[in-house]
């Protein structure tokens, strides 16, 4: 374990205040409905308590010396970043599927793929029971690469899912995303991303860890707890392995029992991947406009409307060119 000691003045953020918002996304597929109620029921109280804590800390006039400890504890084994084993037998390698959404209904648990296929799945764990019916949700789906072919669907917010698909399909976005900024910061500090692990599930929320090491010295290693949606986005951009805790893979994983092909005539309103993006204070947002164009292009490709997809691609290129010109004028 490594420690740093220095005078620091910063607002205090309590771990318990972070827990409520973390539950809404990066969660398992079995409790989406109850999580939504828990989140909205506690949001106002949480925001007020967090604001009060920040206001209280900002009135401090005295510098205090604090100690920051870097350690890894998400997997519950007490291992630290310095002694982690990249080939730990408790973890299995995985790959990211080009899945766009998941849903549960009368036909069972379905994963909609980017190429139009519908994968019908069942719980790998016999004790998993039947999932409640719920509408389509954006999701990141990991496939175990240990020969079992198990899938681990992680329900996420729409934006991380869109950005992940953009990274996997090499869709260029004019402005750097948060994940690109993190990648550049790691490079500037002389570190490199080693791997990402989905480590555990607490109630219905999954947790992940991002491992970094000093360039040229793999023994100098630190780790950070992240949401799986963020960690996986970074891993894809940095082209590093994504590992999943074996217990999670086998207890929460899904087995594919049927793989079909969507009809080309499937209406666009049937289980749309994307909904209208949030806009700050209702005003036009260039980022939202750009993602709308990306959304429409990808939707057309999914439904094999390639002529229309080419038109959206051209519109996207013109929009990005105008935006770049506006930036320098």
Swiss-Prot record:
**SUPFAM superfamilies on file:** Hypothetical protein TM0160
GO MF terms on file?
A: nuclease activity
Specify the BFN domain's residue ranges.
121-256
Q: Where is the UVR domain?
A: 287-322
Q: Which Pfam families match?
A: BFN_dom, UVR
One cellular-component annotation, GO: nucleus
Cellular localization per UniProt: Nucleus
Broadest EC class? hydrolase
Is Nucleus one of the keywords UniProt gives this record?
yes
SS bond partners: none
Q: What is its EC number?
A: 3.1.-.-
Q: Which UniProt keywords apply?
A: Hydrolase, Nuclease, Nucleus
- Family indicated by similarity: Belongs to the bifunctional nuclease family.
Explain the purpose of this protein. Bifunctional nuclease with both RNase and DNase activities. Involved in basal defense response. Participates in abscisic acid-derived callose deposition following infection by a necrotrophic pathogen.
Name this protein carries in UniProt: Bifunctional nuclease 2
């Amino acid at each position: 374990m490594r420690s740093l000691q220095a005078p620091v003045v910063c607002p205090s953020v309590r771990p318990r205040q972070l827990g409520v918002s973390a539950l809404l996304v990066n969660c398992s597929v079995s409790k989406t409905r109850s999580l939504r109620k828990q989140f909205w029921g506690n949001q106002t109280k949480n925001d007020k308590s967090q604001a009060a804590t920040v206001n209280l800390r900002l009135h401090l006039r005295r510098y205090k010396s604090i100690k920051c400890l870097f350690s890894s504890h998400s997997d519950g084994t007490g291992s630290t970043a310095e002694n982690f084993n990249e080939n730990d037998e408790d973890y299995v390698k995985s790959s990211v599927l080009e899945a766009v959404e998941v849903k549960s209904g009368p036909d069972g648990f379905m994963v909609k793929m980017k190429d139009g296929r519908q994968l019908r799945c069942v719980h790998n764990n016999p004790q998993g029971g039947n999932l409640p019916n719920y509408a389509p949700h954006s999701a990141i789906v990991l496939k175990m690469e240990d020969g079992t072919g198990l899938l681990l669907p992680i329900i996420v917010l729409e934006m991380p899912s869109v950005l992940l698909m953009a990274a996997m399909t090499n869709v260029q976005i004019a402005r750097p995303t948060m994940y690109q900024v993190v990648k550049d910061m790691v490079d500037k500090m002389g570190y490199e991303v080693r791997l990402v692990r989905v480590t555990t599930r607490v109630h219905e929320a999954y947790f992940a860890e991002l491992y970094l090491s000093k360039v040229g010295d793999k023994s100098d290693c630190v780790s950070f707890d992240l949401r799986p949606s963020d960690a996986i986005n970074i891993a894809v951009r940095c082209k590093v392995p994504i590992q999943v805790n074996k217990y999670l893979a086998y207890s929460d994983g899904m087995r594919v029992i049927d793989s079909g092909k969507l009809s080309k005539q499937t209406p666009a309103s049937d289980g749309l991947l994307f909904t209208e993006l949030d806009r700050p204070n209702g005003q036009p947002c260039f980022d939202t406009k750009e993602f709308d164009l990306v959304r429409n292009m990808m939707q057309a490709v999914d439904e094999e409307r390639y002529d229309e997809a080419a038109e959206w691609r051209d519109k996207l290129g013109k929009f990005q060119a105008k935006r770049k010109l506006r930036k320098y004028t």
